[in-house]
Amino acid sequence: MTGINTHFAVALFCFFSFSLRAMSQASQMLIDCTQFDNVTRTSSYLSNRDTVLSTLRNRSSIGSYSNATAGLSPNTIYGMFLCRGDLNRTSCSDCVNATTLEIYKSCFYRKSALVISNECIVRYSNVSFFTLVEDVPSTARFSTGNSLDSPQFFSQTLLEKLDALILRASLSSSLPVPYFVDDQQHVTQLEGSYDLHAMVQCSPDLDPRNCTVCLRLAVQRLSGCCSHAQFARIFYTKCLITYEISALQPNVTSLGVTKSESLTVYII
């Protein structure tokens, strides 16, 4: 089996193996394909793309990050995946497999593709993106309608926490999961107390300086959209920031107020 039949066989295998999980995740994905740079059906570019994505799928069961390259210029393909550092290997592999399926469904003949889900990032391109920080695209997911009664105090607490985590992450390139820091803090303020759980992570191909640059971009976007939200997730192509606060526990002298919550997703 050669040529286009091989490419469709790979896509069908992915479809039947992972379609159920992918359908449940599709609405939570940012899918970014090149719009005009299509490739021909017989191009060796597609074979190299299939090789890279297959390699990434296989490696996703043994680690939270990998990159791969296949082919010679001008048909070289570069690819990578990055799973959230708090995922186990099975969850990472499931996410990479489902995200790869989405690439085949949405970007089959495109020269580059990027998919960001809640749990992982998968991409490929004909241009090397290794070691680079990119400010677009990015995605923000956050709750609305459930902010604290003292948003300025909370925003200050959150940004101070993220500053500390970014510093720790930039110094952790040699850890088993590089550039990943996960932390929880109990916070008390006027209307009550809550637990603040925050996480920052960079792709291991970045150096410490570029890791910091990427995370600062994420904080900047967070500050502009959702630093008062109950939870938020900011994803760039090489880094991510997430946080969540527990239900407010009123102080003895304060009154508890129940508020509704919804989800907002913004993509740029």
Curated annotation (Swiss-Prot):
GO cellular component: extracellular region
Domain Gnk2-homologous, first and last residues per copy: 27-129, 135-248
Localization of this protein: Secreted
UniProt signal peptide: 1-24
Family to which the UniProt record says this protein belongs: Belongs to the cysteine-rich repeat secretory protein family.
Gene name of the encoded protein: CRRSP5
Alphabetic keyword roster: Repeat, Secreted, Signal
PROSITE patterns reported for this sequence: GNK2
InterPro entries found in the cross-reference section: GNK2, GNK2_sf
Name of the protein in question: Putative cysteine-rich repeat secretory protein 5
Pfam families: Stress-antifung
Domain of life: Eukaryota
